[in-house]
Structures are given as C-alpha cells and as structure tokens.
Amino acid sequence: MLKTENLSVGYGNYVVVEGINLEINRGEILCIIGPNGAGKSTLLKTIATYLKPKKGVVYLNGKKIHDLKPKDLAKEMAVVLTERVNPGNMTGFDVVAIGRHPYTDLFGRLTERDKKIIIESARAVNAEYLLEKNFFEMSDGERQKIMIARALAQEPKVLILDEPTSFLDAKHKIELTLLLRKLADEKNLAIVVTLHDIELALRIADKMALIKNHKVIAYGYPENVMKREIVNELYDLKNANYSEVIGYFELKNNPIKNKKIFVICGGGTGANVLRYLVKNRYDVVVGHLA
C-alpha cells in the first residue's frame, strides 16, 4: 500500500533522517515515535509530498508518490498537520467541505453526493453537531475532529497525521486515539501518525518506528520494538526507566532515608504502596515469602 525504500529526508542540503524503510497496509496504524527534533514531521511531510526526498522513493500502490498529480494524490491520501489553522469565519461544514475539492467542478460547486459525504465524514468522528458552528468558536478538541472530518471527506485510503493530540487535554487525547483505531478498522484506512504519548501509541499501533540520530533505530511490531533498553536509548533516560509491564516510564528511586522496607506483593497489588514509598525516598525491596 504505502512503502518507503531507502528514503532520506531533510531541508536544503541538510539530511535529517536517512535509510528509511517502512511499509504499511490498509487497516493498519503505523506510529512514529522519537524525541523533539528527530525528524518525525519532516518524514511525514516528505511522504505527503510537501517536501522532496533527498534520496530514495515513496511508493503508493506501487507508484512513485512524487510523480502523481496533486488532484490524483488528494483522492488517495489526506493529511492533518500540527500547525493551527485559521479559516476565518468558516463553519465546520465549510471546513469539512474543503475535503471535497478534488471532486468538485471548476467553480467548487457541491453536489448532493458531496453534501452527503461531508455529513457522513463529520458523523464518523462524532462531530456532526459542529457543522453549523463557527470554527473560531470551537475548542481544540472540536477543531481537531473537524480537521479529521475534512480529511475523511477526501475519501482517502491513507491518512497522515502529525502529532494530532498536541493541543488536547487527557480526555480528548484518549477519544482521538480511539477514533484513529476505529477509522483504521471500520474504514480500512492505512494511518501513519506521529505521537509523543508512548502509552497511547501502544494501545493502537500495529507497527512502530523509533527515530533518533538521523535514522530509524527500531521498526516493527510494538511488542518487539518497545523494549526497555531501546526506549531508554531513544530518550537518553538517566533518571527513569521504561517499563515494558506498564508501557510507560518509572522514575528511578534515589533513597535518602536510612530505612530499608521490604514489600511483599505480587500481581500488581503493591503498585500504589511502592509508588508512595519511592516518592517519599525510601529504600524499597520487593519479593515474596518462600
């Protein structure tokens, strides 16, 4: 479906990431993870043809993606970037309608089918109630829903999203993450997304790519990629460790109290007690009775 072959990306004469070999099929989600400045956004913009590759090729259904005409590509791929948009006094309906541009006539007139798809796209992201609302009056979470609805209105087979949860609170982050999984499953979309939240990425990803130091340091199924030593290296962790059990980070314990406390627990029963003791800088040992 979508494939990169020995791809190198960057700006001007500067190569940000090189030797990228990724592949994603319809119905799958590929999450790209990495520290700030690693080149995640540059990679997505190259895949979306906003930037030309420094080397290598991006294929879409076996065709070189940078050779496709913009209108033809817009019918196959939709993109939602991080940058905030300012469409003035446009309503949610007007913004979603932009997604029909590849299909409208010279004057941009909407057919009844176009209008039906606009409503269905908003409904797919639980945003039908926002169609008559002015975009500037919407919350960040509502705006993101409308932007994804606009992308869906293009009737794409591939959806590219750059850090879609950046401006969202915890509730809307979870809702959006679950929405992406739903779209991949129900609409059979191939989704490529960059995320900062590893915990959420693990919940939805079929494949993960970790980027650091100008290259992809790990790529594959999450359970094979998200190993403690790999994630610790990815973020140069000194005062924390990535836990494969909980799928997130645990702060290292630097005890300052002389008492050593032995905690008998198992099966996650001691988690709250252990966190309390570590937070209060006790020297903690864990085990079970023989």
From Swiss-Prot:
The UniProt entry, under InterPro entries, shows:
AAA+_ATPase, ABC_transporter-like_ATP-bd, Metal_Ion_Import_ABC, P-loop_NTPase
Q: Which domain of life is it from?
A: Archaea
Instruction: Give the ABC transporter domain ranges.
Output: 2-238
Q: Name one GO cellular component term.
A: ATP-binding cassette (ABC) transporter complex
CDD domains xrefs = ABC_Iron-Siderophores_B12_Hemin
Q: Which family does it belong to?
A: Belongs to the ABC transporter superfamily.
Please report the name of this protein according to its UniProt entry.
Uncharacterized ABC transporter ATP-binding protein MJ0873
Give the organism, scientific name: Methanocaldococcus jannaschii (strain ATCC 43067 / DSM 2661 / JAL-1 / JCM 10045 / NBRC 100440)
